Amino acid sequence: MSNVFVQQPAIQKLLRDSAGLDVAGGDERFKAIIHRLLENICTLIDDYNVTEEEFWHAVNYLHELGGRQEAALLAAGLGLEHFLDLRQDAIDAAAHRETGTPRTIEGPLYVAHAPLAEGHARMDDGADAGEAMWLHGEVKDTEGRPVANAIVDIWHANTLGNYSFFDPGQSEYNLRRRIRTGADGRYSVRSIMPSGYGCPPDGPTQKLLDRLGRHGNRPAHIHFFVSAPGHKHLTSQINLNGDKYLWDDFAFATRDGLIADPVKVTDREIIAQRNLEGEHTEVCFDFTLCKALSADEEQRGIRVRAKE
């Protein structure tokens, strides 16, 4: 068949009735979105001659996806979360908005209300014998001036690629901290070097990726929310240079301007200044925040998050 079938009056009436287009009340924009979605699905079924067995397999897949709580993971893996970033970049460019540090995907593993420290904190609880990391940088505005009272919200995986809260083997808020900058705009944390990770091998996201001939791996990376009064909230993450998946991230999060170069520190004076036991890796990354045009721009986007 061709999409002429979907355009038949009986099918079009079914789609309009299903979306409530001719029913008073409800949300008109939402109705229009659902109508477009249903029409596109029906056209796809007709164009690709999707069988009943394939249709119900897809319905069951949605059950499995929700049961494993992997919907957000799949959204990242199919590039939809990255698409939102690219679209917002285009909107900002069309409006001639000033740019700072690039945005990139949040991912599904943020947990709200991490402990807040002034200027510096230790992120790890000492249970993971990973390589020590000293992460630091400066928050600046677009004129290069330090931003005081910025909140740098940081989270990353352990050496096994797992995140606290979602991994019952880790302590609460392990590898999660918020740092408030001082007048110098600087932040620093002691932590451990994170590992990249792969999608759960038995999960629905990896099952779909297998059908596409794709892997489900991410490079080692560190997540950030950076916010400050009067400035546009930034959601971003940095990927660590040298990882084999740096430019082959299944979640499409790697972007120019968001790659950090880990540096091995062996200088005993620096080690002593940082109160570390020995050699460690230093990661330096500065952030540039843009001015907010409204109070809403100072806040992170609304979505379901753990403990929020």
Locations of the language-model features?
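Beta-strand-dominated extracellular/periplasmic modules and repeats
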Residues: 2-308
